[in-house]
Every structure is written in structure tokens, then in C-alpha cells.
Amino acid sequence: MTSPDYSSLDPCVHCGFCLPACPTYLATGDEADSPRGRIVLMRALERGEIAADDEGLVQHLDACLGCLGCEPVCPSGVGYGRGIQVAREQLFASRRLPPLAAAVLGVFSRAWLWRPLFTVSRWLRATGLPARLAGGGRVGFGMGMLAASGRARGTTPRETRAAGAAGAAAQAARTAAGAAGAAGAAQPAESALRSAAATATVALFRGCVMDTLFAHVHDATRRTLEANGYRVVVPEGQVCCGALHEHAGDRAAAEALARINLAALAEASDYVVVNSAGCGALLKGYGHLLESEAAGALAAKVRDVTELLAERGPRPGGALSLDVAYDAPCHLQHAQKVHAAPLAVLAAIPALRIRILTSSDKCCGSAGIYSVVRPAMARAVLDLKIESFAEADPVPQVVATGNPGCLMQIGAGIRAAGLRIRVVHPVELLDESYRVGGVYGGKAGRRKGGKAGRREGGQGVGCER
């Protein structure tokens, strides 16, 4: 192993601006659970003053969520994220992971394990049992997370659908009138978008959790992108992105998965689209992870789905009269530095009332497998966010966030608190708006001969399977 490089921590002057931005510090009040305290520990590790298997060191470094909320508030530009990653790789090389963490990571390393596991989970979810068993205890919270992974039903109230249908009819009338009044005028938007589609081909990254528990978000991603002029393809041979392994310090496992994805996604496309903030952050970092020109070229093409939609407007849909609180995933706002695009997507939905609550930029406590291996701390972090939802006036009808872990963690927390709030991905709202507004022309999600999704090599794409 090469000598660990902690130079990204050099600018730290221990000013403490990071403390109020750190979820674990806010939850415990312990300096060692803050970025500043952890930097002191990492420097001691670097100098050999503390062993890599020291119980206290491991406890405080493992407790870091990796949310990177400390970086944007740091006046000195400390690269905390890079430092904690170096430390975790050093710790991983010197100890065995706890059995639960090792087992979970082992599953995600093997598609032949996680795909059947999530298929069974999806069947269980379909019975409605997880929703009935959801609660505040450890088992109940886990059931709540599984229930929250399903498609949010009843997002659009009846009066909203009626308003959207009326708006669609009015838009159709305006389009017809415009066409009649101008000979040789441009064709309606759908024709223009179809002609533009060939100029922008995007490869959908399937992932693991998104491709199984959140296949409906893949469907919405494809539909909304195609409605905005993109051609969506789904290359075969993709696996888990490796983010969970990288966060645990298992660089070798992350690299192995990244190489498989690099080979699968190497086909010609203008972009690689990701609808999971955690996956997108790592894919954008494949160049650094694999240290190769090919990986860097792929990473440069990676975009969050909201980035691609925002580049095209996106085109407006039908009205949805809903109070929506946008909750920014840490790995979208901090790691990828994507702030405006999700709001632009939501702003394209007429009548949507968008709010940014005080907790919107704070971590929810999901952090990959963190909520599984450190449930008490994850719940303590989450509770601060759930309180902000409950205290909002009015309480939002919908929370929109763009990461599967966040969708499940926040959804379970809302169920445990007894709040009637739906949690959805932003593209689900845009997709619903397009349905209400008649953008899909009554054929949303359908292909000749069967279910939704473009097929590559006979595989269904983004469908409920």
C-alpha cells in the first residue's frame, strides 16, 4: 500500500465553521464526531501517534456519514472528503469489517446475489405487509424503508388531475389555433423533439437498488428524457457502481466493479445518465478511482437526470397543485455540486408550490449502508429532518429527493412519525405532470409489443419486473 496522502487536509486552521454543518456533531455534541475533531484524529493516524485499529479512532471515523456538508462552509477549502476516504482505506487495510457490513458489501459485489434478493423484496413489498408493519422499532423501520421504495400512489389529487386535463386541453387548442393561423409554421413540439433526439443519445446507468426496487423511477427517467428530445439506450453487463465499497474503504472491490461498468458503458453515447445521487457521484469520480484516460472520459459524460432535463428546459407539463418540499441529496448538492437543476425540473410543473425547508441541505442519515450498520446514529440524524417536516406550515404534501437511500430513509421516518407525506424522486413528479398534461399522448411507458422500456439485447429496461 502506498503512503496515505492526507495533503487535502492541510488548509484546515481549526476554525470550527464546519461544526454546525455536521449532522453527527449536531446529534452527539462530541468534538470527535465533528470534521475538525476527525481531522485531528486523521493527522494523529498519519503521524503514527495512534494505531489504525484503535477502537476510539475507528468509532469516530466510522461514524462520519460522508455527506460532505462541511466542505461548502469551509472558508479554507479543506478537502475533507478526500481525507476521510484515505483514512477509511487505511483502516480497511488494517482490520476486518464488522460481520454485518462485510456481509452487505459481499452481496452488492455479486449481481447473482443482490438481484434475487431485491426481487424477493419487491414481491414482499407487493403484498403490502411492509407498509402494515412499518414503525419506529428496528424491524418496523426496515419494513418502512422497503415500503417507501415503492411507487408513491395517489400523489396527484383528483382536483389537480382535473386542472391538469383542462390545461392540456387548452394547450391543445392553442396549438391547433396557431397551426391554422400560420401556413408553413413549425410542427408541434413533439415532432421537433423527435427530430432532435438523434443528436443526443444517453446511456442509462441501471445500478442495483434503482434497477430493482426503484424500476419505476427508471421508467419515469426514460419517458421524461425522451419527451425532451433524448434517445435513451441501456447497455448490458452493468453492475453495482461500487459506491458502497468505496465508502467502506474497500478500494479494490470498488475498482473491480468500476472496471465492469466502464466496459459496459464504453459504447458511443453523448451522456451517461444517472438517477441516483450516490451512484452519480462515484461514476463522476471513476477517473480518479481507476486513474485511466478511458475512465476519465466516461466520468466526463456522466450527468444526473435533472441536469439533462434542465439543459432542455425541461418542457412544461400539466398542472399539479401540490405543496412540495425539495430535499437535496448530499451526494448531489455537495459531491456533484448540482443545485439548480432539480429545482428547474420541478419549476417546469405548473401550479407546483416548491419550498426549501431549513433541513433541506442536511443529511438524512441514510449514507449507503450506514443506516443498516449504525441505525441509532442514523435515526438521530434523521429525526432532525423529520421534525422540520412536521413543524412546517403547512406541512408539505410531498417531499422530492433524488437518491434511493434518501427516499427510503426519509419515507420510513415519515411513516414512523405518523405524517401523511409522500416521498418521490423529482422525475416522478415531472412524469406525472407529463401524463396529466397529455405530453405522452396516452402512450406513456408503452412500446410496440409490450411493456415499458427500450430493449437492448433482449433485456427489459427500467420496467417493473
What annotation goes with each model-predicted range?
Residues 6-25, 54, 58-78, 361:
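Cysteine-centered iron-sulfur cluster-binding motifs in ferredoxin-type domains/subunits
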Residues 1-4, 33-55, 215-216, 338-347:
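Short, charged low-complexity linear segments at domain edges
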Residues 11, 38, 60-63, 301, ...:
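Residue-level recognition of specific faces of alpha-helices
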Residues 25-56, 77-103, 424:
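Non-heme iron-sulfur electron-transfer modules
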Residues 17-20, 30-35, 230-236:
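N-terminal glycine-rich anion-binding loops that anchor highly charged ligand groups
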Residues 1-9, 50-61, 226-230, 349-354:
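Short, intrinsically disordered, charge-biased short linear motifs at domain edges
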Residues 80-465:
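Iron-sulfur cluster-binding electron-transfer modules in prokaryotic oxidoreductases
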